[in-house]
């Protein structure tokens, strides 16, 4: 099935990253599928048994679950990836070593590689590697909501530059709220508007909420 066939067969939208119970409930009213994301901040390896049990409970409650790894240690990405956690694996971008390791390790998605940076954190080399390894780039709305006007303008500029590379190299991608509260949840139209604002055509923005998310969710 082609990107265009999936995108325009009907309005079917997927929210790939919601991190709060109330946010998930609200997003479920607006999207056909919602992935609940557990945020995991690591400096050292976790208790794997406890983590697997928690993810099992979350799958029972929400169905589709992702694990967002936030770490300063690149080696932990490979370690988490090697475990059979039965959840999508996202990595919070920012540190260039983390961005590179996430892509090299073949995680499901790198979220906001520009996060906290003075540049996009994503270049031609990483774009080519992400395309080959099927690592999606997550364009997240949440940091924009929490930034001052200067910060928002800078983030949008980094998003635009990243989108140009994503488009050129045909990197998988999705647009998401990354909502950590119900107040940060936005519907498909608002997320599509973000895509259009960073340079996507309407079909490209739609595919970032439909075709690409669905191909990722099918892994579960």
Curated annotation (Swiss-Prot):
Chief location bin: cytoplasm
Disulfide partners: none
Compartment(s) of residence: Cytoplasm
Top-level EC class as recorded in UniProt: hydrolase
EC number: 3.1.26.5
GO MF terms held by the record: ribonuclease P activity; RNA binding
Recorded GO CC terms: cytoplasm; ribonuclease P complex
GO biological process: tRNA 5'-leader removal
Keyword entries, A-Z: Cytoplasm, Endonuclease, Hydrolase, Nuclease, tRNA processing
InterPro entries in the cross-refs: Pol/histidinol_Pase-like (IPR016195), RNase_P_comp-3_arc (IPR023539), RNase_P_p30 (IPR002738)
Xref: Gene3D superfamilies: Metal-dependent hydrolases
Catalytic function, reaction form: Endonucleolytic cleavage of RNA, removing 5'-extranucleotides from tRNA precursor
Subunit note: Consists of a catalytic RNA component and at least 4-5 protein subunits.
Family (UniProt): Belongs to the eukaryotic/archaeal RNase P protein component 3 family.
Function: Part of ribonuclease P, a protein complex that generates mature tRNA molecules by cleaving their 5'-ends.
Annotated NCBIfam families: PRK03892.1
Matching HAMAP family: RNase_P_3 (MF_00756)
Name of the protein described by the UniProt record: Ribonuclease P protein component 3
